[in-house]
UniProtKB/Swiss-Prot annotation:
Protein name stated in the entry: Transcriptional regulator GfcR
Family: Belongs to the purine/pyrimidine phosphoribosyltransferase family. GfcR subfamily.
Gene name in the database record: gfcR
Pfam families: Pribosyltran (PF00156)
HAMAP family (alphabetical): GfcR
Domain of life: Archaea
Keywords: DNA-binding, Transcription, Transcription regulation
Amino acid sequence: MSALEELITKAKALQAEGHTPGQISDELGLSMETVTWLLTQQKGMEAPKDVHIDWAAVGSHGVLLNDMAMMMLKRFLYLEEGGDVRAIEDLPDTVVGIAPSGAPLATLIAAEEGLKLAVYLPAKHSRSEAPTGSLSGTFSAIAAQRCIIVDDVVTTGTTLSETIAFLRQHGATPVAVWSLFDKRGAREIDGVPVHSLFVISRLG
């Protein structure tokens, strides 16, 4: 079975389990456009230009996941493009993890630095007729907080734009986006700087 056939099989299996296209997009690290194609593709149709990132070997192991979270933290503190090293005091008040994959990373970062933790539930996970994003009531409020947004993969930037807008509408100030992988090559999204560990580029 080819890699593409495996993705089609995985996408259809997740759909059969009741996952929404948005949830499948997060599970497979693919754009919504690609997921739609995987679920509906017909022979002869050209696949969207996308890159599948499978980091389950790291995400499924607590110690390795913590290592990745600490790399994200150090990327922000010690590898600033201008050459300056940030102080721990420069960290904002709250770490906002985008569910599902950004939440465990955000938890580890918040625990390491003694910061507040919030979890954002994006609109694409909602099953309502008019889907909207929301903040989990179990974790920190964000009003008047300076926030870092954490996610695993930047694909199109749509979910991050949604999160940034939500935070601003609710009185918070998003100061940075941290991600493991950036498939868009974004330096900023809606005026918020993006700090990624790895940037994925297609040639040609």
